[in-house]
């Protein structure tokens, strides 16, 4: 099982990744190269990235699943402080989209209840939801990767992968 250890100081961080809602294949391929990765919970939250959205392949092409977040008046909100907005029916919509896109695939009936439980767990913060999902994905893919979280903002390090998964950088 993938372990999750809290809070790493800047001098011990080696491979810095963003929090991700259903990490894309590129994220997983890069993460599997390391025995451990650090999720940056103290970075400035960036909208329209893997932090709150995931793309799935539906019958009509690529469909973006977006977790709505509460707007904050602060200009620079850290990722660990981003709250999920439950005023919309996003959970139901995401689960329906996943069922519609993948309901007839092998093992769907085995995995879907676990995905449903994670999405319906209704954590307050986006990073909590993403951590549950990432840990679950790593476990199902048998990736033995230690996950840690930053306890302070890190401007940059050698293996800084926070911005390479953004569509803006492609």
Give the location of each predicted region.
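Residues lining hydrophobic/aromatic ligand-binding pockets adjacent to catalytic sites
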Residues: 2-170
